[in-house]
Structure formats: C-alpha cells, structure tokens
Amino acid sequence: MSSRSPDLPGAFLGAPIAHRGLHDRACGVIENSRGAIRAAIEAGYGIEIDIQPAACGEAMVFHDDTLDRLTAETGAVRERSAEALGRIALTASGGETIPTLGEILALVDGRAPLLIEIKDQDGALGPDVGPLGDRIAELLVEYAGPVAVMSFNPAALASLVEAAPRIPRGLITCDFTAEHWPRVPAERRAALAALRDLEPLGAAFISHQWRDLSSPAVLAAKAAGRAVLCWTVRSPREERIARALADNVTFEGYLAEVPEDAPGQSAPSPAPDPRPGGLGWRRRPHRQPAGPRGH
C-alpha cells in the first residue's frame, strides 16, 4: 500500500471547476487554450486541463491523442515535438497554439485551483504509460498554487507516489461499462468500478461520473474521508443532482454559480466585454464545439 497522498486543498471544494477551461468556440476560445484558462480565472472558477505527451516527452495541454478535431493538422500528438506542436494553431481560435503545461502553470500562477488530468497512454488503462507522469512531477516541483493530478489509469499516477509526494493525486472513475471501455478486460473493469486501486495508490480523491455517484464504492470512498468530485455536468439541473453527493462539480455548457465564499479563488474580474469580438459569457449560454463528451 502506498502512503496516502496529501488531502485535496479546500480550494478544489469551493468554486465549480471549468472543464478544459472556460471555453466558447463561438467567441474563439477553444478548450485547453490559454484563452480558456484566462476566462476561467477571470470568472472565479477552478480549472481542469488535460495532458498529452509530445514526441520529446514534454507535457502538452491538449485533450485528444490526435490533432484532427481541434487543428487543421492530422495524426498523433505524441509524434510531434513540443516545438512543432507549439506552432500548430487551434482552429477558430484567432491564432492560439497548443500550450505546454509549463506555460499554463506560469499563466495560472496560483490564481485558481488547477486540476491536471494525465491522459491514458496505454490505450486500455494498462501499465504502458511512458514517462509523462515523471515530466509532470518535474514541472510541479516549484509550483506554489493549489494543484492536483488525476487519471483514469492508476498506472499513470504510480510514478507520482515518489516523484511528487506533496501533490494530491486522485482517480477519475465511472461505471466502466464494456460499451465505453471495450479494450479493458472485464475483470479489470470490475476492479476499476469497485475503486480497488484507491488504497494501493494512496489516492486522496476521486472524480466520478456524475450519473453514477450513488455507486456503493463511491459512497464508501466518501465515508472514508476522500473528497468526491464529479464530471461533467452540463446544466444547472445536472449540477443540483450531482451536488447531493459530490463535494464539487466539473462543468461545461453553461455558467455555474460561484459561491461568494469559495476558498482559494482570486476575486473575479468584472464581466468580460460582451460586445462583438469580446467574450460575452454573461450575456448568453456558454457553447462548446462538438467533440468527446467524456472526461
């Protein structure tokens, strides 16, 4: 059994967490972009981002394992160098390019809690995860703001036990059905759904599929003192349902309400400019591009 990671800071249990930042394609603000991160900070939200590796091992802030959905390029992210990826424009962004984790850490600079997802590199939630966790740990050594790392793949977190013992680590979890996880063996899916990796990893929290929060395994994790976040609510109604069991929500597709006493947040800036060309978050529903609806 690994030693328990530090508890999730209270900052993650206050303001709702913007899924891939506060993105709105109609305004030219793309998921996991610098603009989406800035918008989330200005609105007083926490931030969730995704990490994929470049060919050189650098940690890139990008959700998909291929470039096709969000850029004019094609092919695997891991086949391009960080330098090359940093020159690729995100579509409909007005020229924004793919950022590195180091750039996003410098941008956030402790002004909002930052939840970092390590994307699965094995393809079936197995042990072949590469050195991405080590690179993330290296980048977080000097970071002073509220930060936590999580993954669907327990193996992706294993290197952090020794490499980043002061960083809270958690598992992203769900019901792990065969329909959604066809490459994962049935026995392994059952173990993942039962949250059997929590104790061996010393995980301090989970981020669970919101529709499955009443799972006995989730209730047991909460009773054991682990924080329970959830993903991904897309309306005030879904948020109300999720909050009956979850300590906080990851959201997109609308503007979640920020509690006035939310811990760990910078004071929200005035509402962004709603004029044409400005970010009109306060004037109309937040919209997202078509894409994966998972975490």
Question: Where is each model-derived feature located?
Answer:
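Phosphate-group recognition and catalysis centered on beta-loop-alpha active-site segments
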Residues: M1-H295
